[in-house]
Amino acid sequence: MRALTLLALLALAALCITGQAGAKPSGADSSKGAAFVSKQEGSEVVKRPRRYLYQWLGAPVPYPDPLEPKREVCELNPDCDELADHIGFQEAYRRFYGPV
């Protein structure tokens, strides 16, 4: 009984495999690649807000560092710059110019 069931399943599997091998895609599928989409369709799916993007890179624009002007002031003073290398910018700026 098991052999007969196994033989029937193998015959059914063989029919399914040979039937799919000879089948051709339908007219709707053959005109369009199912795995590929056009650039326009792809960009409609993945839309990003453009307000924070570099125009040439497509990466988000970094927010300006509020401490950058103070860091430049400390870099112009050789003593502050040297101390910043040892203890960090914020502490060196605080020691030379007051609170950050």
UniProtKB/Swiss-Prot annotation:
Q: Where in the cell is it found?
A: Secreted
Residue ranges the record assigns to the propeptide: 24-51
Is Mitochondrion tagged as a keyword?
no
Keywords, comma-separated and alphabetical: Biomineralization, Calcium, Cleavage on pair of basic residues, Disulfide bond, Gamma-carboxyglutamic acid, Hormone, Metal-binding, Secreted, Signal
Q: Which InterPro entries match?
A: GLA-like_dom_SF, GLA_domain, Osteocalcin, Osteocalcin/MGP
Question: One GO term of the cellular component aspect?
Answer: cytoplasm
* Maturation and modification: Gamma-carboxyglutamate residues are formed by vitamin K dependent carboxylation by GGCX. These residues are essential for the binding of calcium. Decarboxylation promotes the hormone activity.
Q: Which residues bind Ca(2+) 1?
A: E68
Instruction: Point out residues bearing the modification 4-carboxyglutamate.
Output: E68, E72, E75
Q: Give the GO molecular function terms.
A: calcium ion binding; hormone activity; hydroxyapatite binding; structural constituent of bone
Using the chain's own numbering, where are the disulfide bonds? Answer: C74-C80
State where Ca(2+) 2 binds.
Answer: E72, E75
Residues annotated to bind Ca(2+) 3: E75, D81
Tell me which residues make up the Gla domain.
52-98
Tell me a GO biological process for this protein.
positive regulation of neurotransmitter secretion
Q: Which residues form a coiled coil?
A: none
The family database entries (SUPFAM superfamilies) matched by this protein are listed as:
GLA-domain
Q: Where is the signal peptide?
A: 1-23
Function noted in UniProt: The carboxylated form is one of the main organic components of the bone matrix, which constitutes 1-2% of the total bone protein: it acts as a negative regulator of bone formation and is required to limit bone formation without impairing bone resorption or mineralization. The carboxylated form binds strongly to apatite and calcium.
Q: Which family does it belong to?
A: Belongs to the osteocalcin/matrix Gla protein family.
Q: What is this protein called?
A: Osteocalcin
In its UniProt entry, the species of origin is given as Pongo pygmaeus (Bornean orangutan)
Q: Which gene encodes it?
A: BGLAP
